[in-house]
Amino acid sequence: MSHVDDGFRSLTLKRFPQTDDVNPLLAWEAADEYLLQQLDETEIRGPVLILNDTFGALSCALAEHSPYSIGDSYLSELGTRENLRHNGIAESSVTFLDSTADYPQAPGVVLIKVPKTLALLEQQLRALRKVVTVQTRIIAGAKARDIHTSTLELFEKVLGPTTTTLAWKKARLINCTFSHPQLADAPQTLSWKLEDTGWTIHNHANVFSRTGLDIGARFFMQHLPENLDGEIVDLGCGNGVIGLSLLAKNPQANVVFVDESPMAVDSSRLNVETNLPEAFERCEFMINNALSGVEPFRFNAVFCNPPFHQKHALTDNIAWEMFHHARRCLKINGELYIVANRHLDYFHKLKKIFGNCATIATNNKFVILKAVKQGRRR
């Protein structure tokens, strides 16, 4: 938990999921402060759009202006809602939209936290291009090290003239003025053929490894089990290639695709529809914080390629939460399979949670682990 006084109001903010007290990560950064410093409240006219507000620092500060919070992270939405409640601000003061929704017309102010991937930034800038006017004030912010020439060129190409500020507390801002530059249309998804299959994999802008199959998933796919039945889960599904493979290998199983990214879940749905339409009735698609709210003892198996980043921050909190949720939702003798970088040492984490862990396969970079939910542990 951390405190910030941004000139609009004094706030107490926390990350979601919360980090441990030994190595706490802040729920806000200097770029949030820097963005808010640029705004004179008297100049805010028209809708306020906030893009990629990680834990609600901007939304909480500008809540009295009824902002729209736009992004591709359900965790960020949950974190923002939690911080609104914690600071005594009505959740209804902020309207949440995912990045593929239609943005409000003629915004007065657009504040952008520059995302980690240029593909998501381009998708968002193209969406903004449809609604901003020459009067819209457009300001983006990030750590100075995360603003590159390619970032500025993208703003110039999609929206118009772009300048940067001096660095302040290692943060930098981008100011942009809309000028209707000519711009060719771009497809909503990036597609590629999946080797050794007849499948074409479609990827929305914010999907991990959208330009091709990542090496961890490739290794995982080589060791997926067959002859499973009942309900199984592709947890943190991304574009859904693991769940798609499980559907093909296990015709008696139903697969639940789960991710906190709406773009990931949409990509998974599209990939089942276009590659295994006959299996679509065996699928469920869920935007969720891991398996929050899912009933216990439901699944026969969970498959997971857990992230070790949250936006720009390195953290294993999300993976830790996924493992705990998986154990709660597995049936007795249900199995959790994960693939991970070897250096992350998830073996001991799983053994602590499940009381057991076995190595299924390993190479010079990745390891595949299996843990079984045993009846004696609660």
Swiss-Prot record:
Q: Tell me where on the tree of life, at the top rank, the source sits.
A: Bacteria
* Top EC class, one word: transferase
Against SUPFAM superfamilies, the record matches this protein to: S-adenosyl-L-methionine-dependent methyltransferases
**Which catalysed reactions does the entry list for this protein?**
guanosine(1835) in 23S rRNA + S-adenosyl-L-methionine = N(2)-methylguanosine(1835) in 23S rRNA + S-adenosyl-L-homocysteine + H(+)
Whether Flavoprotein counts among this entry's keywords is no
Q: Name one Pfam family in it.
A: MTS
- What EC number(s) would the UniProt record show? 2.1.1.174
Query: Does the keyword field hold S-adenosyl-L-methionine?
Result: yes
Tell me which HAMAP family the record gives.
23SrRNA_methyltr_G (MF_01859)
What is the designated name of this protein? Ribosomal RNA large subunit methyltransferase G
Organism in which the protein naturally occurs: Salmonella paratyphi B (strain ATCC BAA-1250 / SPB7)
